[in-house]
Amino acid sequence: MASWTSSQFLYEETKPWGIQFLEKFKRSGRLSFKQYQALVFILTFVAYIAFHAARKPNSIVKGTLSASTIEGGWAPFDGPDGTALLGQIDLAFLSVYAVGMFVAGHLGDRLDLRTFLTIGMIGTGLFTALFGVAFWANFHSFYYFLAVQVMAGLFQSIGWPCIVAVLGNWFDKKRRGMIMGVWSAHTSLGNIAGSLIASGLLRYGWGWSFLGPAFLMTFLGIVVYLFLPVNPPTVEAERDGTEIDSTMRLGDTITESLLESRMSTGFDRKAVGFMAAWKIPGVAPFAFCLFFTKLVSYTFLYWLPFYVSHNMIGGEYLSEETSGNLSTIFDVGGVVGGVLAGYISDQLNGRAITAAGFMYLAIPALFLYRVFGHISLTINVILMFTSGVFIIGPFALITTAVSADLGTHKSLKGNARALATVSAIIDGTGSVGAAIGPVLTGYISAISWDAVFYMLMTAALISGLLLTKLIIAEVKALLFGSEDEVAASSSSPPASRPPIDVLV
């Protein structure tokens, strides 16, 4: 049996059963390359909608579980330290999620991505449901909720590295920012779906808020196992009417045929080591940038419904259900922000410029939302939407296009076996910030919400500053066409450079 440090694949890829079934009814016997791309795009898109939807019930039921409700809350969260305990639950989930991300990324480059992803989805569905089961089982042990969240975080961590790796196997760098900008809408749509499902079911008891997303996750996990093609060689896909063994171009150098490199050798390139992945140009600054970006975005993810329900808007307090529904406006802004950030970064050939610019604009957006959001519902909606655009936009850009770019960086010489590892490093580091933000908010909000927003604005500022070196390199490239400098310092080769045509 291969050891943990083994750099070879530990599995044999097979064509999914669902695709074999579809091919029996197709006249040509095979799906086209574009049909496979569409299938991968849709399946990975809805899969991560489900992942995000499964995270949302925690924020929706916070007000119900805490002592501020008429019913008196739910022990052990109904005491004066209830918000702090809820923050600790969030910390447990996100801490394990962050650590698990690094491990999942390491394994994702070595295991069958389809099976590994399915395990993550079904496991997530199971433990999301178990949190809600406490409602009917009348569980009140803090350690029960803690243990369930720890396991949920562990299985959730499997999703992202696997999904980005699969998507990267099917789409090259050309227009990747725009494509992944659209695809990254899954984050916001998942939050919206989770909010609407959890809020809609809350009236029947808070346990139902967890069961709805749990069933969705489990069902889609089965669909993914049956239909998701991990990479072109697995399904013998042909690209744009050409044979799969057409040569692949790395810069100006023609290397071995695609068939030889991916089929004859069993797709058997060595996986990039964890420390080696950190040394890929651009990985470290974007990883630490995402630390602060996710600190801001996940604070909103976990606390925005609670904040809305506990602060007067237009002279009145909103119900828990209404607050949960209203909070989806932040994610609607995130959909626009993700697409906009991807498009701008493609046009400028500058991922760092775009990400930092959005985070700098998030600072006044946060300030205005805190100061003027209470005046009326209309103003609150406008400012919440604006905040979502500038906060989720760079979050989506870094976790998708940037991660895929760096996972196929030219320094890897065409080896796409770093995709899951690089994605895990970047999103895993960001998830540490995501764990810290909500738990700090649980304590700081008990003192002052103003202090919470000052913390978020400071994090947004630091996030932008961390990309300063990359921004300088990208600006020089824009002004003087210094591609070599960007290649050495920035996140990815500029879009004007010939794309690495290796079906990554």
UniProtKB/Swiss-Prot annotation:
Cell location? Membrane
Q: Which GO terms describe its molecular function?
A: transmembrane transporter activity
Question: InterPro entries per the record?
Answer: MFS, MFS_dom, MFS_trans_sf, Sugar_P_transporter
Q: Which UniProt keywords apply?
A: Membrane, Sugar transport, Transmembrane, Transmembrane helix, Transport
The organism's place on the tree of life at top rank = Eukaryota
Does the keyword Membrane feature in the UniProt annotation?
Answer: yes
Q: Show the stretches that span the lipid bilayer.
A: 31-51, 84-104, 116-136, 145-165, 178-198, 210-230, 280-302, 324-344, 352-372, 378-398, 424-444, 452-472
Q: What is the membrane topology noted in the UniProt record heading this document? A: Multi-pass membrane protein
The record's account of tissue expression is: Expressed in the root-hair differentiation zone.
Provide a GO biological process annotation.
phosphate ion homeostasis
SUPFAM superfamilies attached here? MFS general substrate transporter
Pfam families given in the database record: MFS_1
Any one GO CC term of this protein is: membrane
Annotated PROSITE patterns: MFS
Entry similarity comment: Belongs to the major facilitator superfamily. Organophosphate:Pi antiporter (OPA) (TC 2.A.1.4) family.
Please identify the protein, giving its name as recorded: Putative glycerol-3-phosphate transporter 2
Which species expresses this protein natively? Arabidopsis thaliana (Mouse-ear cress)
